[in-house]
């Protein structure tokens, strides 16, 4: 008799294991009771931050290897959070593969500490802040005929702030609409039509989204934006709206990367790091940039005058992460050998797809109402022109949690 394998779907959207007892229960009074253990949670959050950064660069390198002519944009926090949540229902080698593929060494960092870290990370990112719009959420859509393990539902709710929804996957169109509506609402309309088609054999869909909308501490003046050339490669040049500001910046030239490194703060706790390699040095930048270098850039402050040109853009990218994560060692969960019996014991389960969609918009908007003007003192000597008119990297980093929210490469700003 043939073994019947039912399907689970992992969906991740971005803008800008189990023991018989509940892991949340094990952590009760520690990670779950935030008022008594905030410091412990924060420490756990900072413990997983280097792993998240290393995971981000691992994903980046895999995507860059696939194509050097396409934009790259993804949220490592969204991907890691979703798979950490999935690990709560995985067992045996499936469970180990997921956590090790995310970059965690289980002999150095206990699993409970990993989930405490994600719990605090998600809690911190979702704190109301009128200065920036940053929201993240996890939704678990369960086929109405399926019976999920209670401890799994309890864990994903308490540790990963997940909501569970009953859904009829046999009505594929209606199920698709409900999932897409959930993501569109959570991302404030920025992520639409994440799911294009659904398999009727799907038993559950795990959905993660992250949406960020920030305001520059020092905005660009709209009237200074002009159309200029962006050199995609030696053969291709496109016209793009280029923002411009003359002033003081956290900007320096890194000899090791042969690149300009620019940090622009948003109001709140998020910093954007833009890295512009010299002509012909993009490969050198990609080969040498790592978590340690990024941490140094974020720690040390520079004050340099410059005439800055930065493209105004709106890009989005969609990935099926099955291949990329497979190269990082996460294979079993996508195969007939998956052990997800911590999610449901009724039937064998595997993940059929892991879709991730991320969108980035960069524009002039600042912290003040229209017409506000910033005046800065700059040296009398002529400042250098720093023009992001060729492929560059960008990393959005949350300073509170020390985590990379988004990582990307802009090859062509006109590529939607």
Curated annotation (Swiss-Prot):
SMART domains: SERPIN (SM00093). Its main location: secreted. Disulfide bonds: none annotated. Pfam families: Serpin (PF00079). Coiled coil: none annotated. It is found in: Secreted. Plasma. It comes from the Eukaryota. PROSITE patterns: SERPIN (PS00284). The modification Phosphoserine is found at residue 381. One of its GO terms (cellular component) is extracellular space. Keywords: Glycoprotein, Phosphoprotein, Protease inhibitor, Secreted, Serine protease inhibitor, Signal. The record marks 380-381 as: Reactive bond. Glycans are attached at residues 68, 105, 143, 269. SUPFAM superfamilies: Serpins. Residues 371-390 are annotated as: RCL. Residues 1-24 form the signal peptide. GO terms for molecular function: serine-type endopeptidase inhibitor activity. Interacts with CELA2A. Interacts with ERGIC3 and LMAN1/ERGIC53. Interacts with PRSS1/Trypsin. Inhibits human leukocyte elastase, pig pancreatic elastase and bovine trypsin on a 1:1 molar basis. Belongs to the serpin family. This is Alpha-1-antiproteinase. It comes from Ovis aries. The lineage of its organism: Eukaryota, Metazoa, Chordata, Craniata, Vertebrata.
């Amino acid at each position: 008799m043939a073994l019947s394998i039912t399907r689970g779907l992992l969906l991740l959207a971005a803008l800008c294991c189990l023991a018989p007892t509940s892991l949340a229960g094990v952590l009760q009074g520690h990670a779950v009771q935030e008022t008594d253990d905030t410091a412990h949670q924060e420490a756990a959050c900072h413990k997983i931050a280097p792993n998240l950064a290393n995971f981000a660069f691992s994903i980046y390198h895999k995507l860059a290897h696939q194509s050097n002519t396409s934009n790259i944009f993804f949220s490592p926090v969204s991907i890691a959070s979703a798979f950490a949540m999935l690990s709560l229902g995985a067992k045996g080698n499936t469970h180990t593969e997921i956590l090790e593929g995310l970059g965690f060494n289980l002999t150095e960092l206990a699993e409970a500490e990993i989930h405490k870290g994600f719990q605090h990370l998600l809690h911190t990112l979702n704190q109301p802040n009128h200065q920036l719009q940053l929201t993240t959420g996890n939704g678990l859509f369960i086929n109405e005929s399926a019976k999920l393990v209670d401890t799994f539902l309890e864990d994903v709710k308490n540790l990963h702030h997940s909501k569970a929804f009953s859904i009829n996957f046999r009505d594929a169109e209606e199920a698709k609409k409900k999932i897409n509506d959930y993501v569109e609402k959570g991302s404030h309309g920025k992520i639409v039509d994440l799911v294009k088609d659904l398999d009727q054999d799907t038993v559950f869909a795990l959905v993660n989204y992250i949406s960020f909308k920030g305001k520059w501490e020092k905005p660009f003046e709209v009237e200074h934006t002009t159309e200029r050339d962006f050199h995609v490669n030696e053969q291709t040049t496109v016209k793009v709206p280029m923002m411009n500001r003359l002033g003081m910046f956290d900007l320096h030239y890194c000899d090791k990367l042969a690149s300009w490194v620019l940090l622009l703060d948003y109001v709140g706790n998020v910093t954007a790091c833009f890295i512009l390699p010299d002509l012909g040095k993009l490969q050198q930048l990609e080969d040498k940039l790592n978590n340690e270098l990024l941490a140094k850039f974020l720690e040390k402050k520079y004050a340099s005058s410059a005439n800055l040109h930065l493209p105004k853009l709106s890009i989005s990218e969609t990935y099926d992460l099955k291949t990329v994560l497979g190269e990082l060692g996460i294979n079993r969960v996508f195969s007939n050998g998956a052990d997800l019996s911590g999610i449901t014991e009724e039937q064998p389960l595997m993940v059929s797809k892991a879709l991730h969609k991320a969108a980035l918009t960069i524009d002039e908007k600042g912290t003040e109402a229209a017409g506000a003007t910033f005046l800065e003192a700059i040296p009398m000597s002529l400042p250098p022109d720093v023009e992001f008119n060729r492929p560059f990297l960008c990393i959005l980093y949350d300073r509170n949690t020390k985590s990379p929210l988004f990582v990307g490469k802009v090859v062509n700003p006109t590529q939607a």
